[in-house]
Amino acid sequence: MGCTHSKEHSTANKPPAVGILRCHGARWMPAQAVVGTNSYLFRTVHAEVKGLRYLDVRAGKELSVSQKKALKEAVKELDAEGVVAITGDCGSFVHYQTAVRRMTKTPAVLSPLLQAPLLATMYMKEETILVLTNDSSDYDQAALESNLVEIGLSQEDAERFVIQGLQHIEGFSTSEVADMSDERTWAMVDTSERLRLEIMSTIEAAKKANPSLRAILLESTLLPSFSDSMRQTRGVPVFDAITLADYLAAASTDNPRFGSNIDASVWSSAMERANVMDELSQRATPAIGILRIDYSYPPAPGDVDYPGSYYYRTVQEVAAGLTFEAAQEGRPLTAQQREAMEGAIRRLEAAKGVVGITGDCGFLMNYQVDARRMSHLPCFISAMMQCHMLAASFAADEEFLVLTANGKSLAPKFGEMLSLAHVTRPEDQARFHILGCEDVDGFDAVAKGEAVDVARVTPGIVALAKAAAARRPKVRAVLLECTELPPYADALRHALRIPVLDAITLVDFVHSASTDNPAFGVDFQKSSKVFV
């Protein structure tokens, strides 16, 4: 089958693309699966792994010499297309996550399960996440936990993810998915009300059995077209192959709301996405709560506290007494600080439409555990939570820059923050390198609480990062810890040509799990559409 786009065409003037590895002979319908080009608001290319069939992938079969060669060729094919990330058309590709990330410098996130560490961090230890798979008779709870531990979760956290199979519904059993030998109309083509109701009934039964369920993770790549129905019916976030692919693309795409739009020919798809998302009314689209530290400053476009940084509504509440200095030190909360923080979180929870809570300072990672204990909503109060995604996406010897307002301030608690993000092994923590921006011309305004001249500061931020990347040739991505650094993300993406994650990519990612997908789905928030 090969890539759907010819290698002969230059990628210079094409929008960013996500590469998708396909099982050999897979013919599930595009409208139903992750491979559908209409499922995305960016370009996708596909490469078939010859000889590696669905049954092999599902079982996590050890690759033969020929299969390993075919996998390398497929990855090479996708890299030749200039893809910004590589994923798989089957959640069971997680078995080959380690192998593939050794084959490429492109971030490889082969399964929706790679979102699990972020989810585990967002919710309390007592809360659970339902994992929907095609068939739990051959991918059971033990297999799921084994994969999650291999990804990087502790056994305790892995047990919080509860498997639920759909093999009792026509079209989902492993044998039915694998049986594509004829041209008959496959059962999964059916998106009838009957099928939707069967899936929703299964979820409802799982919820009754697990009352602590707070989110749904779709391991199956055949299910994203039902995500909106799940969001509408269950009222909980639903993470799937599409939320993951969107997240990966955003890390390498110009931000249309405040970005540089440096090369319109390359980043035009970002503007197309902006136009689609701007059709959603902020009144009906879910909102995000922002927990603010006790620190006042004029935010620039792209800052977490700047309302225009989002296409949706945000609500802000200050934790009085929790100062910037206190957040930096990361000491245990005083009684007064704890009361103020909990009060702010309660007010955010009570605000209309709020579906999750973030923070306006990366150092709040020190209080992520406190925040999630105080709230029934998902809490993701620091960009540092994304570190595990980086560690898992690249080869074990590849490295990352973590840009911060002041390197000396971040260093003392850096290891603890990484551990909270499920980056626990010393060899993995050593892959993350702090890069302080305190000496960049004009950036001292951040420490002074003054307005930052973004145009003045940008060249210095870029020069700093380029010099650091030159010293460390194995750097493959950048994380912006500070919530005042996203205004420079696009300039860094353009200069370094590597993914840049920040507080905005994190917030957009979590928000997408509770929002109507404008590319497909049931449009359950249609009252929010603005027709022009």
From Swiss-Prot:
It comes from the Eukaryota. The keyword Plastid does not apply. Keywords: Lyase. It catalyses: S,S-dimethyl-beta-propiothetin = acrylate + dimethyl sulfide + H(+). GO terms for molecular function: dimethylpropiothetin dethiomethylase activity; racemase and epimerase activity, acting on amino acids and derivatives. Its EC number is 4.4.1.3. Gene3D superfamilies: 3.40.50.1860. InterPro entries: Asp/Glu_race. The keyword Lyase applies. Mediates cleavage of dimethylsulfoniopropionate (DMSP) into dimethyl sulfide (DMS) and acrylate. DMS is the principal form by which sulfur is transported from oceans to the atmosphere and is a key component of the ocean sulfur cycle. Homotetramer. Belongs to the aspartate/glutamate racemases family. ALMA1 subfamily. This is Dimethylsulfoniopropionate lyase 4. It comes from Emiliania huxleyi (strain CCMP1516). The gene is ALMA4.
